[in-house]
């Protein structure tokens, strides 16, 4: 397994303008010492080719893999014009990911406006369309399970979306902290993961996440032959400067430990 870091870990620093994308890359390489980074649409100051080329070159020079780009899309609105604009947005970020050499784009199913059953067919069609586009670009889409009234709050929801879309370019991106029923759905879907977001809502003194059994998760992924990326994701209230290094060190110890420890 390979350890990466999501730029959203530093949302507060980005919002305060004390960190930009280049600074994030440098921090990941020299201070956090992770192998890869996951970027998000909300942190790009621009997407002109010259900027993307420079960003990709910076990551390469620092020895970092850009493992994915996250887009904040929503295919749950009733209005056709809204969905079409969201489809166009996802396609744009697929092109950005391709320019950066990233193999994956994180997507959401979205939040249904009204009954989910009424919005479901259009959401499935939208995901299938962007999956087709990603496939033509040679990329994969990672569908992240999400809460807060989203389509994919439980394992049943996530599995149904993946089955209904039924596209080889759309895979399960497991977010360990987003299922409304917690571990039960994590355990049911971990075997399908093409990518993992290791969420930290809290950080204990030893760096562990009190609400998520990461030793059990890492052991389960290892038994199932998972050798892909685990992207660290920090959303705890504790300051980024203290919470992130402690939590990341804990996660690294679990990943680096010999099997059976």
What annotation goes with each model-predicted range?
Residues 1-99, 167, 203, 237, ...:
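N-terminal pre-domain/capping segments
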């Amino acid at each position: 397994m390979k350890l990466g870091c999501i730029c959203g870990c530093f949302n507060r620093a980005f919002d305060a303008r004390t960190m930009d994308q280049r600074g994030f890359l440098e921090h990941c390489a020299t201070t956090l010492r992770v192998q890869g980074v996951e970027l998000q649409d909300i942190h790009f100051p621009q997407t002109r080719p010259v900027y993307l080329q420079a960003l990709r070159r910076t990551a390469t020079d620092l020895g970092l893999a850009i493992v994915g780009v996250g887009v904040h899309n929503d295919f749950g609105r009733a209005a056709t014009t809204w969905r079409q604009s969201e489809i166009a947005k996802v396609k744009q970020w697929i092109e950005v990911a391709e320019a950066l050499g990233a193999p994956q784009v994180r997507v959401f199913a979205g939040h249904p406006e009204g009954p989910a059953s009424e919005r479901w067919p259009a959401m499935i069609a939208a995901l299938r369309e962007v999956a087709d586009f990603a496939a033509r670009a040679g990329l994969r889409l990672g569908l992240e399970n999400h809460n807060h009234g989203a389509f994919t709050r439980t394992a049943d929801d996530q599995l149904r979306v993946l089955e209904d879309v039924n596209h080889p370019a759309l895979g399960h991106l497991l977010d360990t902290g987003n299922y409304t029923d917690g571990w039960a759905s994590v355990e049911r879907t971990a075997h399908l993961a093409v990518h993992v977001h290791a969420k930290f809502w809290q950080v204990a003194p030893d760096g562990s996440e009190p609400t998520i059994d990461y030793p059990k998760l890492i052991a389960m992924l290892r038994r199932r032959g998972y050798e892909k990326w685990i992207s660290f994701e920090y959303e705890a209230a504790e300051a980024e400067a203290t919470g992130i290094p402690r939590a990341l060190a804990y996660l690294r110890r679990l990943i680096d430990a010999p099997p059976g420890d």
